[in-house]
Structures are given as structure tokens and as C-alpha cells.
């Protein structure tokens, strides 16, 4: 059985998955630490999406060299797997966003909003243009939920490092900070859902991934009743599989 090692090197964590090459089934997955995962020995090739900069790439290169496997460092392109990249300079689009959009399109084959709620919160719009074809129309990047909270705590003297919970009617500073950051993220998502829905003339599904997606999901489901919300944990890793296969 041929396997692909997919690696998503993000700003906070490096996630990996071993996927069955023919089907894309995830056989093993994890978060990279100091040890070389034993499961990597199952693989015959490696696909990497790195948005963490050259230092992280150098560390990964040193580890992957020990495996002796062919490695492809993916980048965003003008077109891949049925999706056209609307960026003025396609290569400047973060490859994690590109991979997530490709996976979302391949899974759902319809206009959709793709949200990655990590260190940054990215919200990207895909429009179906023809059977099997889509276009990335544009998207936004804003501080992620935790980064918003940490930035406020470091910049405001009377807030400090506090851990609140979401409440409809916050009555403490820590809960107000937590609730405010989640409302900010959910509001941005709602705005782009409305924008894309008006363009496409239909209710738009929202595909969520990233570490803070679980925190955003209940708020979105409660207040945005006309949209379908789908939680996908491994969009970037699955997108790398599609990119590696070069599926149409």
C-alpha cells in the first residue's frame, strides 16, 4: 500500500498525516514534537505546506532528509484541482489557504466559504463557475481568536492574562474579552457569507477548520440560521493530497 506523508507547518503547530495514496484516507495523524513519528516510515513520498518561514523549513528539511524520501514543498499556483486562484500574484497566496480551499471544493463541489481558525483567522470565498470548476474570489485575514485575546491582554493595563468563557451577557472582564473575540470572528464570517450568498443567489455552506473552529461553531449555528456549517479537522492535509495527486 502506497502512502503519502502530508505536513502542515503552521505558525503555532506542525500537523502531519499519513494518507493512503490512492484513496486519500487518513491512516494516522498527529502534531509534530521532538521525536520522529514512527508512522512516517510507512510513507513513500512527502508533501509539505509551510507558512512558518525559512527557519521552520530548515528544521523540517533536516528531519525529512533522514527518511530519504522525495519531498515536494507545495506553493499556491494559478490553477489546481479544479480551482482557479484569483490573486494578482498567485504564489503570494498562503499555501495553507490554497490547500484548504482545494480540499473544500473537492469535498463539496459548490460555492462555499472556507474558514481556517488558527493563529490567524482566514475567511475565503469560492464560487462555482461550471461543473467541476471554481474560482477563489478573495478572502480576509484577521487575528485569530486567541491572538485577539492575547493582544488585548498585553496592550490594556487593566486586563492582563485572563481566561474567560463565552456568555451571551458577559458580566466579567475576562468573559467580555472572550465573548468579544468570538463575536468578532463570527461577525466577519457572517459578513462574507452574506456577501457571497448575494453574489451566488443562494445560501452558502461554511467549511470550518483550525484549532478555534470548535469554539466558533456554536455561535455561528445559533445566530446564522440560513447557512450550513461543516467542521473539517484536516482540510490543509487533505488538500495536500489532492495537490499531490494533481486531480482535475
UniProtKB/Swiss-Prot annotation:
InterPro entries listed in its UniProt record: ATPase_NBD (IPR043129), Type_III_PanK (IPR004619)
Major place of residence: cytoplasm
Residues at which ATP binds: 8-15, 119
Keyword field: ATP-binding, Coenzyme A biosynthesis, Cytoplasm, Kinase, Nucleotide-binding, Potassium, Transferase
Group of enzyme by EC: transferase
Protein's UniProt keywords contain Transcription: no
EC number assigned by the record: 2.7.1.33
Residues engaged in binding substrate: 87, 94-97, 173
Annotated cofactor note: A monovalent cation. Ammonium or potassium.
Biological-process GO terms, alphabetical: coenzyme A biosynthetic process
Active site: 96
Self-association and partners: Homodimer.
Protein's name according to its UniProt entry: Type III pantothenate kinase
Gene name of this polypeptide: coaX
Amino acid at each position: 500500500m502506497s502512502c503519502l506523508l502530508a505536513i502542515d507547518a503552521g505558525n503555532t503547530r506542525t500537523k502531519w498525516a499519513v494518507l493512503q495514496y490512492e484513496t486519500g484516507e487518513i491512516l494516522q495523524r498527529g502534531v509534530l514534537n521532538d521525536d520522529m513519528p514512527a508512522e512516517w516510515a510507512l510513507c513513500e513520498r512527502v508533501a509539505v505546506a509551510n507558512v512558518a518561514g525559512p527557519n521552520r523549513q530548515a528544521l523540517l528539511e533536516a528531519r525529512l532528509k533522514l527518511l530519504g524520501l522525495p519531498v515536494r514543498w507545495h506553493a499556491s499556483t494559478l490553477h489546481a484541482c479544479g480551482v482557479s486562484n484569483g490573486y494578482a500574484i498567485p504564489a503570494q497566496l498562503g499555501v495553507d489557504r490554497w490547500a484548504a480551499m482545494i480540499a473544500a471544493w473537492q469535498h463539496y463541489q459548490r460555492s462555499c466559504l472556507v474558514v481556517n481558525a488558527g493563529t490567524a483567522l482566514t475567511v475565503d470565498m469560492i464560487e462555482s463557475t461550471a461543473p467541476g470548476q471554481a474560482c477563489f474570489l478573495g478572502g480576509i485575514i484577521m487575528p485569530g481568536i486567541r491572538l485577539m485575546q492575547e493582544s488585548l491582554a498585553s496592550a490594556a493595563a487593566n486586563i492582563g492574562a485572563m481566561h474567560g468563557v463565552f456568555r451571551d451577557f458577559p458580566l466579567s472582564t475576562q468573559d467580555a474579552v472572550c465573548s468579544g473575540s468570538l463575536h468578532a470572528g463570527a461577525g466577519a464570517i457572517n459578513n462574507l457569507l452574506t456577501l457571497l450568498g448575494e453574489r451566488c443567489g443562494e445560501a452558502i455552506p461554511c467549511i470550518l477548520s483550525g484549532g478555534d473552529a470548535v469554539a466558533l461553531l456554536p455561535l455561528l449555528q445559533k445566530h446564522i440560521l440560513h447557512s450550513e456549517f461543516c467542521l473539517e479537522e484536516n482540510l490543509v492535509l487533505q488538500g495536500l493530497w489532492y495537490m499531490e495527486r494533481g486531480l482535475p
